[in-house]
Amino acid sequence: MNEVGVRFERGKLFLPHVMMAADAMTAGVNALKDLMPEGSASSKMGVIVNGTVEGDVHDIGKSIVSTMLQSAGFEVHDIGRDVPIRNFIEKAKEVNADMIGLSALMTTTLPGQRDVIELLKEEGLRDKVKVMIGGAPATQAWADKIGADCYAENASEAVTKAKELLA
């Protein structure tokens, strides 16, 4: 998937190719998941809750990020699209997440990313849980403004930044 990401960034592959590769990767990871011993690499890399914030029904990019993170060895809990803010916090508590990934594809849903971070603070979890944001309207400046730990422009970058933050 890393090579697919690189080729996509260079304009050598297009979104349908990336989606097919992600589907194949997901099928492969799922087929092998049961064969992996308990306490294997995925538990060592970190636990990530990933979803698209409330009001946004787009999930192609988020799904590709989830697949690539999982294939890189992270335990990923993809909680879907149009996810209420509180659900991110509840799932993070349930699985003892190290990081929450917040996707938004519409400018009108960007505030949901900020709201999750604020709720993490209210719940006393902000120092324990890293936050990565992404999506077409998201930027590094937005990440800085809302206090996210990082911004990833694409799935390959999301894997790199997750590895850096959770090392």
Curated annotation (Swiss-Prot):
InterPro entries: Cbl-bd_cap, Cobalamin-bd, Cobalamin-bd_sf, Corrinoid_p, Met_Synthase/Corrinoid, Meth_synthase_dom. Methylcob(III)alamin binds at H58. GO terms for biological process: homocysteine metabolic process; methanogenesis; tetrahydrofolate metabolic process. Transmembrane segments: none annotated. Acts as a methyl group carrier between MtbB and MtbA. Belongs to the methylamine corrinoid protein family. This is Dimethylamine corrinoid protein 3. It comes from Methanosarcina mazei (strain ATCC BAA-159 / DSM 3647 / Goe1 / Go1 / JCM 11833 / OCM 88). The gene is mtbC3.
